[in-house]
Amino acid sequence: AAYGIDSDAAWVELLKERLEQETPGIWNVANASISGETTDGGLRRLPDLLDKHDPAIVVIELGGNDGLRGFPPDVIRNNLARMIELSQMREAEVLLVGIEIPPNYGHRYTTAFANVYSSLAEEYNLAFLPFFLLDIYDGEAMMQADGIHPTAKAQPQLLDNIWPELLTLLEQ
């Protein structure tokens, strides 16, 4: 949702630019992200968004705020599962984007949280990016001072992280 950065610098805006360069006029990107959103909020908003946009592909990158608030993994899983089901009922392909939470939440919780994404990807046979922030934590000036949100400098890498999985869906 471009937290703490100019929304024009966000990876979704970079995606729009890349798609327009590589496939002019073919794809329309609707960014429905909201800073601070939880899976519950996303689930409540999704039916109207599906009606409005009738997407061919739905990218679900949600749950980080749930995890940071310590929500039970089964609640997060159920909300994400319902979002996947709603999207698939509309014949949209789903790309599930995995998120990890900081290790200070404890091994048991962080493992259960991470397993939410991998188990859903397997159960629903989804395109899946296990860890969206791959190569971001290690890069210089890639994370904001909060240690949670990527900087504007990280946005091209985020797009590069998601692109291979997204491209597979775009080419179908």
Where are these regions (language model features)?
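Single-residue recognition of alpha-helix boundary sites
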Residues: 7-8, 109
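Short, solvent-exposed turn/loop segments enriched in Gly/Ser/Thr/Pro and often Arg
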Residues: 33-35
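Alpha-helical cap/lid subdomain in secreted, periplasmic
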Residues: 14-21, 25, 30, 41-172
